Amino acid sequence: MPRCLTHSARPRAGTARVSAERLIGFLGLCCLLLHCAGPSGTAWAARAAAGDPVSAALAKVGLTRETARVNRNDMNFFGGDRYRLSLFDALMDDPLRIPDLIPVLASSALSSSRSVGAATVFAGLRVKAGVRRGLIGDVVAGYEKRLKKPNCLLDAVEQLYEAASRADVVELDAGLPKLTAALPDSLAEPLALLVLAAAEGVKWQRLAFESIEDRDILFDEAIQYVSGLDSDKTDPGLTRRVEHAAGLVDYDYLNTGATDIAMVLDSVVVRLARLASSGAPWLKKLSFTCRTPLGDIIVNGTDPHVYRSALAPLLVVDLGGNDLYLAGGSTQSASNSISILIDVAGNDRYVCPASASRDTSGGSWEAAAGGIDREKPSFGGAVLGYAFLADLGGNDYYDGRNLSQGAAVLGVGVLCDESGDDRAKSFTASQGAGLFGLGIAINRSGNDQYHVYQQGQGYGYVKGCGLLIDGEGDDVYVANDTDIVFPSSQSKEHNTSLAQGVGFGKRADYVDGHSLAGGVGMLVDARGSDKYWCGVFGQGCSYWYGVGILADSSGNDEYNGVWYVQGSSAHFGVGVLHDALGDDHYRASINMAQGAGHDFSVGFLLDESGNDVYDAPNLSLGGGNANGIGVFWDRKGDDTYNVSAAMTLGRANIDAPRGGLRDRMLCLGLFLDTGGKDKYSKQFAGNGKTWTQPGPNESEPVPTERGVGLDR
């Protein structure tokens, strides 16, 4: 899918603000002391630089922290973009700040995952469409004040009808006042809060999409656009129409409505969990249904239930039992633009109708599957709207197809699983995938398994942010590389994964010139010994002005990939893998891995501590190619470096015919190991050594190829 035109490149938000203020104050104090101290201050600065391994290594090749970067003006000679993000600029302009910035960003993501509302705000901010609802005032309290007794749910539904105000809107059920009045306040109030938030969401959606002429057609074409991103058979006219429409959307308005619903959802799930745990006898056989312009409201008690695929609900609340879902929590049409599913307890199964016939449990759901379009979103998947799925407990099974399990195009899609040992399977654009929108997958605890083929597990396409945040547990992340259905341009024997922290853009400079800058993809795992597998493009990787981040906080982890993996980037991207604690094993089999940047890109692998093993290919461990910057830094531990190729351990190659502009532009490979007794397969590298390496074209060397390694 991504074409790389080269022949050789085979903490909490408040805490973050306080930390930033302290850092600024500290730097200001240092500058003041240096200014006042005169010559002795200069000497103090020199000694400080000598103690900095980064500065010490760079000095060996005539660089400083200030000059070791991709010059944006140089980059602009070759690349064009739209939707370029400020996060990309910040990291590209000063890549050696990555060890300071990325851990804070990952910590903020993890803190935000305690609240669906906070996570929605966090994701929006990454793509310059963040709306800080609740920064001043309490959003939920505002909705609570609007509850009108004695029949608050009826009033909320009436407000939703008014907000929808469509010519084809269904009429209010005649018996609804009696039905809603019969519900106790402990149930009616949380339902009413969500319906009120949905009514406001409709208004924000109308503002966001007011320049879109036909949302029904766009709904179907947006799904086809996503499904065809790795196909040469995609209709060019459809592509132009979807991308034109995406440029008309007001993403600030779009995310405003989603954020309100997310914040109300955080409050509602607490109330519903309290209600379910009360053990009230009437909960067991509870059953309530009513129509709304956006789909049905369905509420069931603690008995097991089956939710048929023909449903396109606005809201499903299930208070317990081992349930089977073939629908719910996903938008099914432009008119079903908001869908919320809350399951309070039970070992539940969420099975996309397209996946029902390949269920592996021995049962068959084909009879219930019906004729639902197999490409439509499912279970936290949104198109042109909002989808939320909250599962509060149990060992659950998720089986999707496309746009599932926290994914969105032109919308916001969220999956939040509170606890349990869960399994999630999907095909493409799932498990934290944002494309012209926000896709968020949160799993707070449990030993979980994630399986996808492509575009998932923290994937951000154009104007999109994809987040997969896992709180704790020994987890397994797989981007399938054995069943080859997306053969990569780099190696047909492997899939193009685009998974596990990937920011990805549309490169069209060699097609029609209409390139689009990539988004932000983040996979953040807090605790546990985890295993990661992917093919090509994954594990902290980016392409075409995207930002891809994989951050793992602790555990003895295993990383397995092929090409453009483990802190690498191609063509104007920033890719980072940050592992904080544990004895880890990194394996990459072919090329461009473990701190490698290609073509005005930055690739960075930072491992903070542990006795680690690196099985590295060519262009790795601090490999710069085609004016890219590759940085590798293992800070502590007794490490082992198994390498046989030449372009590794701090080496750079401009990889272009001599005499062009690229000869005058920096290409850097930087390797750092700053602690422990290490083992190297290369004789020139070793404990306590510093080394430099020339570019591979020794007959025509250029001074802008800088390669250096340092072991302390």
Describe these PLM feature segments.
Residues 2-4, 19-302:
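Terminal non-domain segments
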Residues 351-380, 431-432, 456-459, 478-514, ...:
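Acidic/polar low-complexity surface segments
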